[in-house]
Amino acid sequence: MTRDEFDAYCKSLTATTNVVQWGGSSVWKVGGKIFTICSHWGPVDRDCISFKCTDHSYQVLCELPGVVPAPYLARAKWVQVQSNETLTDDDIKSYIEEAHAIIAAKLTKKQQRDLGLLPA
């Protein structure tokens, strides 16, 4: 998945905002809280996608080649996909959507309603 494809997909999710920070990283948020990042963090010389995941997904994904605990964020169960061969674009989109849902669920009910994540 290219950075442009990553940004386009994240933009399509409900109530998302984007900021470029931390050395040019594309940081996507819902309700002001980060759920995924496309960055050059780590040992590979290309953009890598990092996202929040469930405890189970974290364990499973970290066993795959090309997926590592995300730099600076691993303690919060974030992974970084460093290889395009490990997961398909559809897999990555699914995990990004799950990350969006995980972070959105941590917002207050009022915030969720205000952002259109819950019925009014």
Q: Model regions: which residues?
A:
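Charge-dense, helix-prone N-terminal extensions
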Residues: 1-120
